[in-house]
Each structure stands twice: as C-alpha cells, then as structure tokens.
Curated annotation (Swiss-Prot):
Residues 76-137, 342-397, 625-736 are cytoplasmic. Belongs to the PRM1 family. It comes from Aspergillus clavatus (strain ATCC 1007 / CBS 513.65 / DSM 816 / NCTC 3887 / NRRL 1 / QM 1276 / 107). The keyword Cell membrane applies. GO terms for biological process: plasma membrane fusion involved in cytogamy. Involved in cell fusion during mating by stabilizing the plasma membrane fusion event. One of its GO terms (cellular component) is plasma membrane. The keyword Transmembrane helix applies. Its main location: membrane. This is Plasma membrane fusion protein prm1. Residues 1-54, 159-320, 419-603 are extracellular. Keywords: Cell membrane, Conjugation, Glycoprotein, Membrane, Transmembrane, Transmembrane helix.
Amino acid sequence: MLFSRSGHSIFPLLPPYAAHAPTTNQGHIITMPPDGLTPYLGLRARLSQVWINRWTILLLLVLVRVLMAASGLQADMGTAKREALSACSSVESMGSSMASMPHYLSQGVNELTASGVETAVSGLKSMLMLTVTGVEELVLFIIKVLYQTYLCLFTLAVRGSVHVAVGVIKDAADFLNSTVKEVGDDIGKVVSTFEDGFNKFLDSVNSVASVFGGSVPTLDLNSSISTLENLQLPSSIDKGLDKLNNSLPTFDEVNNFTQTVLRTPFEEVKKLVNQSLGTYTFDRSLLPIPAKEQLKFCEGNDGIDSFFDNVGDLVMTARKIFIAVLILAAVLACIPMAWQEIRRWRSMKERSQLVRKEAHDPMDIVYIVSRPYTAAAGIKAASRFSNSRRQILVRWAIAYATTPAALFVLCLGIAGLFSCLCQYLLLHAVEKTVPELSTQVGAFADKVVDKLENASAAWANDANGVIGHMNQDLNQNVFGWVNTSTTALNDTLNTFVDKTTGVLNETFGGTILYEPLMDVFGCLIGLKVAGIQKGLTWVHDHAHIDFPLLPNDTFSRGAAASIASNNSDASDSFLADAGDQTSNKITEVVIRVVDKVEEGIRMETIISTAILLLWVFIALVGIVRALTLFWMRDRSRGEGGGAPSTSHHTSDAGGFDDVPLTAIPNPSAHSAPAPRYEATISTVVASRAIPTSNSFQHQDEKMGFAGERQYGSALKVDGAPDLRGSAYVEYGVEKH
C-alpha cells in the first residue's frame, strides 16, 4: 500500500488529508487535518477504553470462574450436607446396633464361659481322681518299702543274735548236765565208801554209848548225792530266747493297720469327688444378659448443621473477598494500563515522525510505532550485540514471541493459573474446617464406645461374681477335701510312726538291741516320713483353684481400638466402610466433595499449564529459528544475497513522494542510498519496492528478511555515532 497524493482519496466518502491545506504546503506531509479530526483514535479515545484492557478483562474472567467454583462448591456442600445427615442417621442406627451387641453377644459368650467351666471342672475331676489314686498308691508303696526294709534289717540283726545266744546256752546246759551227773556219781561212790566206814565207826561208838544210856547218829548222804546226780540246768533257760526268736515282729499288723488307715481318707476323697463333680453343670441362668441400647445423637445435635453452615459462611466470605479483591485489582489495573496507554501514545507520536524520514525498512518503522513496548524490549535486548545481523535476529525472536496471538496465549495461561490459585485458596480454607466435623463425628464414636464399655463392664462384673462364687464353692467342696485328706494323711503317718515305735518298744524294750533298732528306724523311716509330711503340708497350703475372670472390655475392646489415635488404617473404624479414606462415613462425604473440587482444579491447572507451555513452544520456535541464522554470515550478491540498495528519487508536481510501506526491496529501482535521519523534516524520499525473483525470496519474506538484508546503510538517529560500530539503527534512542 502506498500513500496516495492529496488530490485522490482511496475512500471516496472521506476527504483526504491536507484537502484544506493551502498550496504553500504542497510537497510536504500534513500530520493533522485542519479541523483536528483524525481517522485514528486519539489519546482521550484510547483512555476511554482503558477499562477493557486485557488484564482487567482477565481478572474479571478469573472472578467469574472463582464465583462459578464457589457456587459449585456451595451446591456440592449442600448435597454433602444431605448425605452427611443421612449418613449420621445410618451411623446412629449402626451405633445403636453396636451398643446392643453385648445383648446378643453375651448369650454366646455366656454359653462359651459355662461350657469352658464345665469342661475345666470335668478335667479337674479326672485330674483329682488320678492324683488321689496316684498319691495313695505312692504313699503306701513308700511306707511298705520303708518298713519292709527296716523289718529285713532288724530281723537279720535280732534273729542272728538270738540264734547264737540260744546255741551257746544249749551247749552250756548239755555240758553242765553231763558233768554234774558224773561228778555226782563219783561223789556218791566216794561218799558211799566214806559212809560205810563212818557208819562202822559210829556203830562202835554207839556200843560204847549204850553203856552210858545213849546212841550216836549215823551219816547218810545218799539223798544229797542222789540229788546231785539228778541235777540238770532247767530247760526253761533257752525258752526265753526261743520265745524272743519266735516273737520277732513281721509287721503284718502294722501293714494291715497302715493299709486300712491310709486308704480310708483317699477313698473318702474319691467318693466325695465323685458325688460332687460327677455330673457338674454350670448354672447358665446366673450369667447376666445386658439390655439393648438405643442411641440418639443426630436429633437435637447441631454439630453437622453448624459445620455446613460455617462452610457456607466461609464460602460466602471467600466470594465477597474475591469479588472485592479482584474487582479492586481489575480497577487498579486500569491505572498502569492508562499510564501505559499514555506512554504508548506519546511513543507512537514520537516514532510516527520516522515515517516522514527516510527509512531503510518501512515495515520496521510500522512495527516500532504499532508495538512500542515489545519493539523497545527487542531493541534493548539487541543492543547487547554489535553485529547488525544478530541484532535483527534478536529483535525478530522477541517480536515472534510477543505477537498479539502469542501474548493472548500467554495471558490466557497466566489467567488460568491465577484462577486455579484462587480456587485452591478457597478449597484450602474449606479443607481446614474438616477436622471440626471429624471432632463432631469422633464424639459420636465416643458415645458408642462409652455405651459399649458400660454394658461390657456391667456384664463382666456380674459374670465375674458368678465365677468367683464358683471358685469359692470348688475350693471349699473339692479342695477342702484335699486339705482334709492331707491333714488326715499326716495324722496317719504320725500314727504309723507311733504304732511302729510301740511294737519295737514291746519287743525290744529293756534289751540291748532297743537303742540301735530305734536309731535305724529313725534313719530309714522317720526321715522319709517327715519328707512326705512336708510335701503333704505344701499340697495343703496350695490346693485351691482360681478360674480366670472376664475383662471389663470384652465387648468394647475392638470398637475402642478401631477409633484409637494410633490406628493408621482409617477404614478400620466401625463408623466407616471398608476402603474408605476417613474413619467415618460423614467425613467421607465431605472428603469426596473436596476431592472432586481438587480434581477439577488439578485439571484446570494442567490445561492452563499446557496453554502456557504452548506459548513457551512458540517462543522456542522463534528462538531456534533465530539461533539457526545466528551464526550464518551475510550472503553477498554472488551467493544469492540481495542487490545493493539504490535510490530513484521522484516527485510529482504536487510535491508528494510515494513512500512504500512494504518490506520487499526493489533492486531495479533507481534510488540513492538512504541518508541519515535529520532533525528537520522537509521531504520524504522513498524507494518503490518491487519484489525480486531469487531463490531466497520466499524464505526471506517469511522471516522478515532477517539476516538477508543489507544493513550496511542502516538508519542512524540524527547522525549520532554508533558506540558498537553497528550499522543497525536504534530508534528514538541516541547514543552518546
């Protein structure tokens, strides 16, 4: 497109610029129409549309999205409230069932307890019978071993001694009997001879005595000698030893006595055990059955209602805050945008003067005027390079990444992420209130557990009372007999010792064997009996039974453990279903809503990030393309580069010059090299751009001739020198 001359307008209904200008202005470009009207927007018109700047609109769109999210969250919370109240009713019903569990479980537990007691008592009976029989036979065996051993010992000692003594006495008696008779015979013979002589002597004496009237007695020893001849040791001299030998005790009486006395208490115990425990049956009616429980914690409890009301108030407060903040931000965004618009307007006015100057690339001038900020950013970034080609490539890459379409994508992605941030803040505020609901529901669970604990404790106390009474009864009626039997057995052992001692005393009392036999008895039997009595005393002291008592938390332990703070698995709670994320169904409803909103925010964040990455991709495309050409050198005409720029200055009679607004060079034009920018504005000399036909034309047009143009005669501002020695022009900035 070319600026037409003043006499011919391309829009018939609109007068051309300078239509009212005097003839003295012919040959010069008039920047403003005489009446001040322009077809483009002035500063005030531009400022009138500041309120619809992109950031205000984006903030308003973010506000709309946040309000939609808040409304959706309120609707979801309303649904969650209804579901929570329904779940509360379910929890209440389930809690009542849980609290009534002792009523149903106690029957089975009572039967289990009674069966366990009956089985234990039956086993106790068998154990007692076997134990009593075993102890009975063991005691009898030990006592029999003891006294039979003792009997063998002193029978050997006593009978051996008696046999020796009786033999000695018999030999002595036979020797004395035979010797005394022979002595008597010999004495009788001697005495008979002596008596005959003596009698003869007496006869002589008697004859003389008769003269005097008397007589002398005669000597007669026959009777005495006859007695001496018939003298023998009495046969009763060994009758005592024979009697002692024949009267040695065999302890048959002791054995019979001991058998009778020892077996009696054992047999009595067996009889009593059979009578008492033969068909033992536990009285199940003594075990209690707790009553049913009916819990009411949903009616009259505003915990759930207050929670959701608080959440609703929180959402409404958040909506008001977002409305106030975002609207204020949208309004405040108009201030910098207005200032930016003013600066843009001033920059456009300043840079519009470049159009009237001789420019190497009019399209660059149009770009700088129409996009002052992005062009300024490109110029500032390009100023770091001294090579004109690289400066142009840097500016081109920035221009590629900051096109209106690219900036729209960038702003859309940023606005989406900001919207997600606002929604996240709203969701985070709601999430912080969830523990309050968990506390309310935890109170429900505590009520259920308290009911269970009370019912379980009452049942356990009553059941333990029955078990304790049974323990006392068994200890008195069964183990009381054991204690009695051990006492009787100790008494029997004492009687056994006394009876044995009496027999020994009767048999060997007053003899030299008594003391040794008593010492042997004490060593062999007395010490063993004392040991048995010590064992029986221990049995007497420890013979009792204690059945284990039922714990108070029999029915409540599992429920209490499921809601304990150290339970890491939330689904273990009796208020939750398997696989739930929380410990109760009421909180699960709220968590489900939060997860739904969170998933939506996550999806929007992903979409916004994808849009932002799309802009990054666009920017990378420009950067990669610029880098591709960055290290390529300028091509000369012989290598396919463009022809040197020439000028062909023409002017019509009206004093207007055709200023080409295309970036395509015209190598056939006859134009002089572009002069430096001058401070005064007099004329505009331009070259008509006619496309060239070369193999790089299409590529150059796509890239804006980046790296393919001849910038040796690039524009300089008002003839100021370039500090880096670059032929590249920096518009609006002078280098000093």
